[in-house]
C-alpha cells in the first residue's frame, strides 16, 4: 500500500475538509476564519469565503444542490451559494462552538454538533430549527446522519457514543396530511421541549476511557467506528435491539481526532495528533500501514463520496490522496487483452468477438492483499504471465489452458526483482536493485546474463524481440539484451508509461503531463504538454496516437497536431483503438467499449500526408464543421479546402482573400456590402494587378479621386478625361483641380483658379504655360497692370505627368495562372477514375501490438567488444536506408553487340551507361562537363568493373581469350525497347564501402577509412538509380563521405605535426570537431579537442567542447570525465593560448590548407564533392576525391535514369 498524493495546500491550521460530489473541488476550513475552495485536479484556488468570525470547524457540500454549509467558533451555521460565492443566510441558536455540520442525503436537513452539549437539526429550505437533541453532558464533538437509515450517531467528550432514532422526525416532517387541532398543539409543544418525542436515544455505547472525538457509520454494514482521546479506535456493531463493542485497534500514541471506514474496501482509516495517518484491516483489526508527517498533527479525515480519494486536514493545510494505484494491469497479445480485474483475477478479452472470458486464475495469493500489482507480461508459448508486485518482487504464473474460473494457479515461481517482462519465448528480464543490473533469466528463473545499469531505473518495458526500454528518471535507453549493449537513448524526464505503434515503428513515452513521440530507434519526433494528467495511450491503425487524460480522450498526429475526441465522465485507460471503437479498462477492472468519431484526426492526417482522395471522401461523407477544422485548414495552407466548409460570408471572404480567389471574395463582398470589406478587396485586387475589379469597386463606392489615379497609373487617357467632366458635374473643386494635374490641362487649371476667385494663381499658371491670352484676360479681370505683377525669376511649365507610352490601357497584370490543386481538380471533376469509397487501410488484427516475443536465436555467450585504438565506444552507424544485400540481376540476353549497346546509349546518357556500353571517351567528357573530372587514373578500375560486370563470357582454354556470350540488363521485366539498360552496381555496394569506412574509423585507422570513403565517392560518380529517393540518398552519402575524409585528413595533419607547434595542433583539434560526423563519431573529435585544450590550459575552449560532448553522451565514465573538465574549466574561464577558432562563428574548413573560411570571405568549391577552398586553390586538384578540378564550371552530377 502506498499513499499517492494528488494535491496539497499550504496554509494555517486546517480543521475541516469536504469533497464536492461531482466536481474536482474541495472545501477547506481554516483556523484563521477563512474557507478556501480549491480545484484539486488543477491545483488552483477558486475562491475564499471570509464571513465567519473565528475558526471554522465544520464543512459539507450538499449532495445535489449548488450550496454548502459551514460552522465555527462564532456559534453560527452559514449556508453559502456556489453560484454567487456569497452567504445566503445564517442559522443561529447554538450557544457555544459548533464542531461539525452535515447535510442529509435525501431530506432538506442539516445536523450540527456543538460545545453547548446539544445536537440540532435544521431545515435549510425554511431556515428553521426542527429539533434539538439533548442528553450528552459534555461537548458534542461530532454528529452525523446514517447513509440510508433514520439514525444519527454522535460522539461526545462525556466518553459516550449515542445512536439516535429520528424516524418520528421524518414522519412528522414528511408530506403534510390532515391533522387535528390537538395534534398540531402537540407538535408545537414537542418542538418547545426539544423534539425529544421525535428523536429518541436508541443506544448508548460506553467503552472509551476518555472523551470521544469522532464516530462514523459504515456505508453498508451495521458497524460504527469511533476515535477517542484514550488513543484507541473502537469498532462497534449494532442490531435492531442492541449495540456492542466488537474490537479495539491500538497503536496511536496521542489523541485520535477522526476515523472513517474505507468506502470500497474492508479498511478503517484514522488520524491523530501523533502526526500519523493509520490504516487498519477491518476484518482482522490489525494495522496495515502507517503514514507519518514530520511536523503536522492531523485533525480530520474525509472520503470522497464517489471516487477513491481521501482528504486529510493537518496543521499546515490539507492533502488529497489515494491509497495505492487504481490502474488495472493489462497486456495485449495479438487479438486478446489479458488483464487483472478488481478481485485480482486474470481474465482475457477477445477484441474480435468483444467478449471477456472467465477468470483463468486467482492471484490473491501473490503479494500483500492491499497492494495493487504494478504490471503484467504475457508469454504465449508457455501461456504464462509475469506479475510485478509493488514491494520489489515478481511472480511467474503458468495459466490453465482454458479459463475455468478463479482457481489457484498450479505453478507459481516467486522471486525478488523489479519490472520483470518477457523478451523472448524462453527468456525474460528483471531489474536487480541490489546489483544495479538488468538480469536475463530463463523460464526456470536462472540468470543467464547481466547487463550493468548505471543510473536509477524507474521501469523496464519490452521493445520488440530481444530488446527492452530501460526508463531512467532523466532518459530512456534502448538495450539489445542479446548483445548486452545500448542501442540508442533519448533524453526525456519522468517517463511512466510506454505505448508502441501497431507496426512497431513509433513509440509514445508518457510522463505525468508530457507525451514524447519517437521512432523505434528513439529519434525524437515531437513532444507535447498537457495541463491535465495523462493516463494512457494507444495507436490506431492509421498511425495516430489516441490518449486519455483524467477527463478527455484526445488524439495527436506525429507532427504535433492534436485535439479532443470525447469527454469522459470518469477516468479510463485505453488499451486498443480499432476504427470507431476504443477499448478501455476502468478502475474497477472492467472492459468498456467507447464509440468515437475518428473523422477529424483522419482528415488532418490525410491532409498532412497530402492524401487528397481521402480528404475529398471525408468532406463528402462526413459532417466536418466548426472553427477548429477551418482554422486548421487555414493554418496548414489550404484555404481553398476550408472554403468548402464555410457558409458565413465574413469567414468565406477572409479565406478567399488568403487564397487569392477574387471571384469568391467579390461574391461575398456584395453580400456584406460594407466599406471595410470593399477596401480590403481593393487592396488585394491592386496587389494582384486586377485593375478592372478595382475600377468596378471604386465606381460602386463613388471613390472618384482614387478612380482617377487608377486610370492614371493604368494609362487609360480616355476615361481619365471623362473624370474631369464628372468632377465638373459634381462641382467638386478639389477633384476638378486634381484631374487637371493628371491630364496636364493647364488651361482648365487656370480657369478653375479664376472661378474660385484666385486670380493670382490663375494668372501664374497661364503665364508659366505660355497662355498669354488667358493671362491678359485675368489681368484685365483683376484690373491690374502687368508691370505691377512680380513673378518668380524662374517658372517652369507645369506638365507634371508624363504621357503613357502604352497604346492600350492595362486592365490586368499578365500573371502566370496558378495550377489547380488536386483537391480543386477533384471538385471540378477534372480527375479521371476518382474513387472515394470508404476504404480503411487494412490492418492485420492478429498482429501483436506490444509483443516482445519472437523466434530469435538468443545467444547466451558474451559478445566480444572491439578493441579499437580510439577506445571511445563501439556503436555502429546506419547510413541512409537499409539496402538489399544482393542486386537482383536481370536475365541474360544475347542480341548483336552493336544493337544492344546502341540501345543503352540511346536510352540514357548517364556516365555509368556510357561506360557499360564501352563509350569511354563519351563517359569522360560527360564527367568533365558534369563534375569537372580531369584525373582519370583512380576511376580506371571502376570503368573496367562496370564494363565487364554487364557482360557474360564462355570459359575457354587457357591459351584463348573467353568468348562473349551476352549482356546483363538492369531489369528483367522490361517489355519495351526504350527501357533497356545495362546492369550497374548499385547503392548496396556504396553502402558496403561506407560501413567499411565507419569500421576503420572506429578502429582508429584513419588512412584506410579515408580510402574507403573515397572509393564510395567514386562508386557514386559512376552510379545509376531509377527514382528520386535513391538519388537523394546517394547525394547524401556523398556529402557524408566528404565530411569524414575532411575530418580524418585534419586529424592526420594534427598527428603529423612536430612537437612544439602547439597553436597549430590546438587549431586542428578544434577544426576536427567542425566536420559533420555522426554524433557518436563526433564524440571522438570532441574528446580529443577537449583533452588537448584542457591540457594546455585553454579552459574556455575546453568548456565548450565538454558541453558539446555532454549533449551527445550524458552518462557513463566518459561523460563523468567531461563533466569534471567542464566544471574545472568553467571555474578558470580563460585561455592561455589564443587560436584561430570561434565556436560561435559561421565558417567552413578549407580542404587544402585546413584553415577556416569565414562567412562572406571569397572561396571556391569543388564541383564533385562540394568541398570549400580558399580562392588561391582554384584550378588545382580536389583534395577530397582527388579526381576533379577545383572551381571548374560544371552542370552537376547526373545519376538518375
From Swiss-Prot:
According to the UniProt record, which cysteines are disulfide-bonded?
Answer: none
What subcellular locations does the record give?
Cytoplasm; Golgi apparatus membrane; Cytoplasmic vesicle, COPI-coated vesicle membrane
One Pfam family cited in the UniProt record for this chain? B-prop_COPA_B_2nd
Spans through the membrane: none
Q: What is this protein called?
A: Coatomer subunit alpha
Question: Gene name on record?
Answer: COP1
**Keyword Cytoplasm tagged:** yes
Q: Which domain of life is it from?
A: Eukaryota
What are the entry keywords? Answer: Cytoplasm, Cytoplasmic vesicle, ER-Golgi transport, Golgi apparatus, Membrane, Protein transport, Repeat, Transport, WD repeat
Decide whether keyword Repeat is in the record.
yes
Biological process terms in GO annotation: endoplasmic reticulum to Golgi vesicle-mediated transport; intra-Golgi vesicle-mediated transport; intracellular mRNA localization; intracellular protein transport; retrograde vesicle-mediated transport, Golgi to endoplasmic reticulum
Taking the first listed entry, what is the main subcellular location of this protein, grouped into a coarse class?
A: cytoplasm
This chain's source organism reads Saccharomyces cerevisiae (strain ATCC 204508 / S288c)
Biased-composition ranges, Acidic residues, are 848-862
- Summary of the function given for this chain in its UniProt record: The coatomer is a cytosolic protein complex that binds to dilysine motifs and reversibly associates with Golgi non-clathrin-coated vesicles, which further mediate biosynthetic protein transport from the ER, via the Golgi up to the trans Golgi network. Coatomer complex is required for budding from Golgi membranes, and is essential for the retrograde Golgi-to-ER transport of dilysine-tagged proteins.
* CDD domains in UniProt: Coatomer_WDAD_alpha, WD40
- Name the SUPFAM superfamilies for this protein: WD40 repeat-like, YVTN repeat-like/Quinoprotein amine dehydrogenase
Molecular function in Gene Ontology: structural molecule activity; ubiquitin binding
Please list where the region (Disordered) is annotated: 842-862
Q: How does it assemble?
A: Oligomeric complex that consists of at least the alpha, beta, beta', gamma, delta, epsilon and zeta subunits. Interacts with the ESCRT-0 subunit VPS27. Interacts with KEI1 (via C-terminal region).
Q: How does it sit in the membrane?
A: Peripheral membrane protein
Miscellaneous field: Present with 15200 molecules/cell in log phase SD medium.
> Where is it found, in Gene Ontology cellular component terms?
COPI vesicle coat; Golgi membrane
Give me the WD repeat coordinates as residue ranges: 9-39, 51-81, 93-123, 135-165, 207-237, 251-281
